[in-house]
């Protein structure tokens, strides 16, 4: 089993963990239907960037 050779300080531990925070979901309003959707994702109606890409 791997064992560290020298103890890492609280500062180094904190610096390593500084990138682990979660961010909120980025939402956009669809131009055609006006509904909220995730950025860079198709809406529930099948629109992406103002164009119909999925036919139901």
Swiss-Prot record:
SUPFAM superfamilies: Zn-binding ribosomal proteins (SSF57829)
Gene that produces this protein: rpmF
Record GO cellular component, one term: large ribosomal subunit
Residue ranges, annotated region (Disordered): 1-26
The species this protein was found in: Shewanella denitrificans (strain OS217 / ATCC BAA-1090 / DSM 15013)
UniProt keyword annotations, A-Z: Ribonucleoprotein, Ribosomal protein
Pfam families: Ribosomal_L32p (PF01783)
The name this protein goes by in its record: Large ribosomal subunit protein bL32
Source taxonomy: Bacteria, Pseudomonadati, Pseudomonadota, Gammaproteobacteria, Alteromonadales
UniProt superkingdom: Bacteria
């Amino acid at each position: 089993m791997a064992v560290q050779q020298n103890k890492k300080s609280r500062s180094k531990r904190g610096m390593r963990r500084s990138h682990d925070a979660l961010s909120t979901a980025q939402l956009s309003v669809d131009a055609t239907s006006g509904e909220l959707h995730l950025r860079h994702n198709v809406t529930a109606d099948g629109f992406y960037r103002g164009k119909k890409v999925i036919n139901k």
